[in-house]
Regions:
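Catalytic-site microenvironment of enzymes
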Residues: 1-177
C-alpha cells in the first residue's frame, strides 16, 4: 500500500499536475483500470458549440485523468489504459482534438471490434498480475455522449451475472434531487 504523504509521478497528468500526493489510504488494496471512451482514430460523438467542434474522446480522456488522479490520492493503484503523452489534464473551455491517443503505448486500431479487444487484452493481462496483490480490482469505462433529447443523460451499468452485489448495484435507480 502507498503510504500517506508519498508522492507519485504520473506524466500523463501534464507538467503542472504530474506530481500526485497520496492523502488517504481509503482505497489501499484497490486497483482500477481507467479507460476513456474512443480515442485514436475514433473521436466518438462530435458536436458543436458556436464555432468550436467538440469531440467526445477529448472530454472523456480529461475526465478519466481527473478520476485516475483522485483515485491515486486516495491510495489506489491505477492503470490508465488510453493514453495521450501530450494532452494531460486541461482546464480549457474547449478541448482541441487529436489522434495521438494510444492503448498503453500501442496504436489504437480503426476497427471497432479490434479496438475493444485491444483494451480487454490490456486489462486482462494487467489483472492477471494485479489480482494477486489487490483485494479489489475494477475497470471503469468513461463515455460522455448522450442520445436522450429530453434529459440529455444516459447511464449504463454492466454487471457480472456471477455476483449478486454487482447485479444489485446495477439495478439501483438514480433519481434527480
Amino acid at each position: 500500500a502507498k503510504k500517506i504523504g508519498t508522492t507519485i509521478n504520473e506524466p500523463l497528468f501534464g507538467k503542472k499536475l504530474s506530481s500526485v500526493k497520496v492523502t488517504s489510504n481509503r482505497l489501499a488494496g484497490a486497483c482500477f483500470y481507467v479507460v476513456s471512451g474512443h480515442g485514436g482514430p475514433d473521436p466518438g460523438a462530435i458536436g458543436w458549440v458556436g464555432k468550436h467542434e467538440l469531440h467526445e474522446d477529448e472530454y472523456a480522456y480529461d475526465i478519466a485523468l481527473r478520476l485516475a488522479r483522485n483515485l491515486m490520492q486516495e491510495g489506489a493503484e491505477v492503470h490508465i489504459i488510453i493514453q495521450d503523452a501530450k494532452d494531460g489534464i486541461r482546464d480549457d473551455a474547449y478541448l482541441s482534438n487529436s489522434k495521438r491517443e494510444t492503448c498503453m503505448g500501442d496504436p489504437i486500431p480503426l476497427n471497432q471490434v479490434q479496438r475493444l479487444q485491444q483494451r480487454c487484452n490490456k486489462i486482462n493481462a494487467l489483472y492477471q498480475k494485479d489480482r494477486k496483490n489487490y483485494t479489489y480490482c475494477r475497470a471503469i469505462f468513461i463515455h460522455v455522449d448522450s442520445r436522450s433529447k429530453g434529459k440529455q443523460t444516459d447511464v449504463f451499468f454492466y454487471h457480472s451475472n456471477k455476483k449478486a452485489e454487482s447485479k444489485r448495484l446495477s439495478l439501483i435507480h438514480i433519481s434527480e434531487p
